[in-house]
Amino acid sequence: MNMKKFASLLLALCMLLSMVVVANAEVAANEIKIGLICIGDENEGYTANHINGLRAACAELGIDASQVIYKYNTPETEAAYEAAIDLAEQGCDVIFANSFGHESYVFLAAEEYPEIEFCHATGTGASASGLENAHNFFAAIYEARYVAGVVAGMKLNEMIAEGKFTAEQAKIGYVGAFPFEEVKSGYTAFYLGARSVCPSATMEVKFTNSWGDLALEKEAAEALIANGCVLISQHADTTGAPTACEAAGVPCVGYNISMIPAAPNTALTSAAINWASYFKFALQNVLAGEKFASDWCQGYVDGAVYITELNEGLVAEGTAAKVAEIEEAIKNGTLHVFNTATFTVKGETVTTCTAYDTDGDYVPDFGEAIVDGYFAESVLRSAPYFGLDIDGITMVE
């Protein structure tokens, strides 16, 4: 075969291969199969927010709803492993899981199916797992918590001015799920936001030891109100706390979704994550056949976090303008949520802090978290690692 003929055949073969690659990419978009393992279902805010985010990402990428398989109400037990295996056996190309306790079970499945991408929300172990197909993702929700705290602080000021209570009685109640860093980071950010506009504010935190239990969250909110808390917020997944607030006439700030439908006369706003940001990122990489980072975290500047609509008839005058000001300051980097000049620990300013534990002994051993005078949250990994107990916040039984 002469060289000219060989070159022509080689060129034709290259063109054919290029068409096959393009065709495969197009088919992948139409045939990709996605799994989502959920701690709850569409009836609770946290999971509903994930479902809505995945649906939005799929719609934007031209992926049909029939290509997504959901595993609802999956507990943080061996059931999560079984769900992951079942999704893998059903041919999923990428599997997402949305609860902290799913992680070890999902990554166990990732070891068995290296050709499938496993993406876990709120977890901490992907980078240390050594698995190229294991990923953690979260968002800088502490930024939105801070903004929601500003909304709350302005409401406290309004109620103080109206004579409903004194400045010294401006006590916030916070219904937390577990005493984990994820929750601690959130309630601390919320408190700092509130105190930035209402300096006399204090806060009590009560844990339910459950991510989503409507009755326990309602009871916790009721107990905090009975203990003198005049505004309630939450890091818990149901409408339990807002329901208690609506019955008691106490203002509240929610999480995940707007709580105005559940508490139209008391809900101010909610801090929320735009999960579509990550779902789109991960799906685009899977569709392209590209490997992607083990950790992902984005915030206000990327549109990954926000506060839901303000209850205009209830929030204090000037709240919308203040929110816009604070959001812009966070985006342009002139406001750092965990500025060490704004809080103390046992009366002392924090100048150094080891970020988090890598060997499981619950003693932080990796990474300096204090950078340029602020605690740099979710930089060394996607999940929060703010573990400080700052002055002004008290835990209650």
Predicted regions and their residues:
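N-terminal secretory signal peptides that target proteins for export/translocation
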Residues: 1-2
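A residue-level marker of the well-folded mature domains of exported/periplasmic proteins
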Residues: 25-397
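Sec-dependent N-terminal signal peptides of Gram-positive bacterial secreted proteins and lipoproteins
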Residues: 5-24
